[in-house]
Amino acid sequence: MGHP
């Protein structure tokens, strides 16, 4: 969720 911290990355696309």
Swiss-Prot record:
Keywords: Molybdenum, Oxidoreductase. It catalyses: CO + a quinone + H2O = a quinol + CO2. Its cofactor is Cu(+); Mo-molybdopterin cytosine dinucleotide. Binds 1 Cu(+) ion per subunit. Its EC number is 1.2.5.3. One of its GO terms (molecular function) is carbon-monoxide oxygenase activity. It comes from the Bacteria. Catalyzes the oxidation of carbon monoxide to carbon dioxide. Heterotrimer consisting of a large, a medium and a small subunit. This is Carbon monoxide dehydrogenase large chain. It comes from Pseudomonas carboxydohydrogena (Seliberia carboxydohydrogena). The gene is cutL.
